[in-house]
Amino acid sequence: LGEARWRRLNRTFFRDWPSHTPWFREIPREFVHYLSEAEIKQPLPAWLAELAHYEWVELAVDIMDCPMPAHDDQGHLLIGHPVLNPTLMNLSYQWPVHKIGPGYRPRKRQPTQLLVYRDTDDEVQFVVSNPVTARLLAILASAALTGRAACLRIAEELQHPSPETLVNHGLTMLVQLRDQGVILGIRQ
């Protein structure tokens, strides 16, 4: 944006936006709402609201107060019910927000899936994902399914000609997600 445009944008936010919280750490979320909802007169990059959200997510995950649920970290991920990391944010963006910086400004939309979560050392982690993995995690988050049942649901949605092949690939992905800390294990 450049320093002058950035300062002008910040001034209009603090002056015009009716913040809904007095908490200092909530101001970044209010700024995300401002960029997404306000009628801002100055021209802004199309990706700016998503970039602000991506930057806010790191703070949100870092300060989440989520106890870790009971789980068996060595349980079989196809037979058991996978337990997701409670700090996980399974995100989809229209822009490659994780690449935007001083040396890169995207000109075209590029759908991007990212997983953001806090690992066992309380460090915020960012993982580039894909639509199938994002969908698998969404299924696991919304339904009490075994890993196998979730993989079979994906196979059905994709109309995969060989569901068992997809289940085998799904197991590989579930193990990788457990190794990364996205999945903690299975329900006890």
Where are these regions (language model features)?
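Short aromatic-glycine motifs in intrinsically disordered, low-complexity regions
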Residues: 75-79
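Long, charge-rich, low-complexity alpha-helical segments
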Residues: 1-73, 127-188
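Low-complexity, glycine/alanine/valine/leucine- and proline-rich hydrophobic stretches
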Residues: 81, 86-142
